[in-house]
């Protein structure tokens, strides 16, 4: 398939490379040109504008937030000249309100639109092992299936209205953030009682919580380096979006408010550029523990 790819951040580079490796014809655009150099060396075609990525069978958008998608897609009016049989696949984590707006914009333009946010960190994207949360017209999803198969290990169908996939992603990210917060607090409690937090995490991930989320983020909390795979600022964005989605439907999310406030606390202490698991430092400060575990 001829596919455009917009957004070559930490996730997008790995995803675009997987498409190239699967022998799709990939045309890329990124606001700053430097990130595209790696995928161009691998065989992608560099485009000079977002519209250049909207000339084939499909176009994938993997940008950071509502504003970035709005600027690249609506601001550049790329749908006006796109082929009518093109499928636009938005894989960004967006607000529900903006996802609904995109539904209307695409319907007016006569362009098929799928929301397909993903689960997984950059290393998972590079390995082609993402989980894809897809919603939209079933026929359009089937047309996109070869692309999803190249990028992910499984595609989960969550509804016929694209914004349903965005709601699912926000719910999952809220749950993941809650798990990180709970592990951080549990580790701080154990350490104050002179229990080795690494040993506690070994028990946690080897018994009742033997799941990838706990294993991955438990390890990051214990190592204490917090190299960014998913930045604190993006985690804060997603908690705000989850709270807004809940408010719109009268669904309280009190723990999301706690996590949001702790992410704000971490950013206020200079950790904005670190992985969102660095929220563990907030629990440590409040427990009167110094620094990160391995940095002591």
Where are these regions (language model features)?
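Hydrophobic beta-strand scaffold residues
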Residues: 26, 46, 112-114, 155, ...
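Rossmann-fold NAD(P) dinucleotide-binding segment
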Residues: 50-112
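NAD(P)+-binding Rossmann beta1-loop-alpha1 motif at the extreme N-terminus of oxidoreductases
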Residues: 1-62, 86, 122
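Rossmann-fold dinucleotide-binding core
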Residues: 72-74, 93-174
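Helical "substrate-binding/catalytic lid" subdomain
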Residues: 162-286
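Hydrophobic residues within alpha-helices
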Residues: 15-16, 35, 102, 147, ...
């Amino acid at each position: 398939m001829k596919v455009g790819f917009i957004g070559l951040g930490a996730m997008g580079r790995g995803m675009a490379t997987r498409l190239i490796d699967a022998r799709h014809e990939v045309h890329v655009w990124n606001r700053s040109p430097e990130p595209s150099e790696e995928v161009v060396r691998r065989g992608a075609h560099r485009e000079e504008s977002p519209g250049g990525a909207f000339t084939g069978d499909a176009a994938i958008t993997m940008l950071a937030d509502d504003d970035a998608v709005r600027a690249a897609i609506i601001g550049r009016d790329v749908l006006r000249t796109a082929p009518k049989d093109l499928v636009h696949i938005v894989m960004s984590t967006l607000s529900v309100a903006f996802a609904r707006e995109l539904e209307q914009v695409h319907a007016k333009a006569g362009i098929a639109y799928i929301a397909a946010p993903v689960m997984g960190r950059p290393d998972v994207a590079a390995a082609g092992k993402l989980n894809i949360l897809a919603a939209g017209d079933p026929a359009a999803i089937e047309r996109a299936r070869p692309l999803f198969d190249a990028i992910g290990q499984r595609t989960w169908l969550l509804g016929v209205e694209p914004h349903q996939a965005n709601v699912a992603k926000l719910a999952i990210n809220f749950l993941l953030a809650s798990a990180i917060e709970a592990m951080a607090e549990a580790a701080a409690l154990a350490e104050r009682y002179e229990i080795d937090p690494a040993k506690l995490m070994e028990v946690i991930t080897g018994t009742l919580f033997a799941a990838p989320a706990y294993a991955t983020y438990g390890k990051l909390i214990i190592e204490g380096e917090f190299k960014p795979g998913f930045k604190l600022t993006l985690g804060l964005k997603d908690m705000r979006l989850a709270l807004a989605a809940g408010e719109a439907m009268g669904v309280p999310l009190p723990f999301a408010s706690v996590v949001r406030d702790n992410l704000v606390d971490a950013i206020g202490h200079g950790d904005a550029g670190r992985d969102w698991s660095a929220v563990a430092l907030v629990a440590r400060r409040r427990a009167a523990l110094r620094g990160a575990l391995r940095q002591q």
